[in-house]
């Protein structure tokens, strides 16, 4: 059976996230998804509870050279990972695997902080090749990730990188599973039985709202910059559609 999962979603536990788990799950259900992976910034959010879709425990680790998704975590990452600041990509992947998770670089070419050779040397479990926010800014970076996955024979994932319920499902992953369960989804990803799907890009307004929300407790100068950016984003959607 094919299970549809958005494997990159942020909740209000992220500094720039704006929706709680219930709203994210309801949005996923309304868009025909079966599961979402909650991957907050450097935080392992508790996803226990009753929801209309499966919630996959995850994290998005900000490393010294890009972001690493941890999917299907069996326990939260040890906070010691961040004791000296941002961890290296290797340390992040090792920590994710130590917690039973699968590691996948997120939007690895937007921006590209590792050479192709260095990225390949990490031997990740999968790689994100469809990201709805990258599709907004530079869709060629998604294509570059797809080409890299083919070259390296890596499992692929797709995720919206949603920071609110309205963004859920912009990109998602189809997993060929034996059943609709976390264990079956994890097994499908580990075996590479996946397909990354692009549905639609994020809007500039949603991206601007994330920046504004993230700056709400920041010093006044940063808040002013975030507000100006939001205004530019709204105008960009209104007058250019890009």
What are these regions, as identified by a protein language model?
Residues 6-12, 24-42, 102-104:
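Divalent metal-dependent hydrolysis catalytic cores, especially in the metallo-beta-lactamase
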Residues 25, 90-93:
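Generic structural signal for well-ordered alpha-helices
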Residues 88, 97-112:
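Aromatic-lined carbohydrate-recognition surfaces of secreted/lumenal glycan-active proteins
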Residues 41-43, 84, 108-112:
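Short beta->alpha connector loops
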Residues 1-7, 11, 17, 21-22, ...:
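Charged catalytic cores and adjacent phosphate/nucleic-acid-binding surfaces used
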């Amino acid at each position: 059976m094919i299970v549809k999962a958005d494997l990159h979603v942020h909740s209000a536990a992220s500094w720039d996230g704006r929706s709680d788990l219930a709203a994210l799950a309801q949005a996923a259900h309304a868009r025909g998804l079966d599961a979402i992976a909650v991957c907050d910034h450097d935080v392992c959010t508790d996803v226990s509870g009753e929801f209309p879709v499966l919630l996959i425990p995850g994290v998005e680790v900000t490393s010294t050279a890009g972001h690493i998704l941890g999917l299907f975590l069996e326990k939260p990452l040890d906070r010691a990972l961040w004791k000296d600041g941002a961890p290296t990509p290797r340390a992040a992947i090792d920590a994710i695997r130590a917690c039973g998770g699968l590691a996948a670089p997120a939007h690895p070419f937007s921006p590209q902080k590792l050479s192709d050779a260095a990225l390949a040397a990490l031997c990740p479990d999968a790689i994100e090749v469809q990201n709805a926010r990258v599709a907004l800014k530079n869709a060629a970076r998604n294509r570059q990730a797809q080409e890299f996955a083919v070259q390296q024979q890596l499992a692929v994932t797709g995720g919206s990188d949603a920071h609110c319920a309205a963004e859920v499902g912009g990109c998602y992953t189809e997993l060929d599973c034996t059943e609709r369960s976390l264990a079956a989804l994890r097994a499908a990803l580990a075996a590479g039985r996946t397909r990354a799907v692009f549905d639609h890009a994020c809007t500039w307004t949603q991206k601007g709202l994330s920046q504004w929300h993230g700056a709400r407790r920041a010093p006044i100068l940063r808040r002013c910059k975030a507000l100006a950016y939001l205004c530019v984003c709204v105008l960009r959607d209104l007058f250019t559609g890009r």
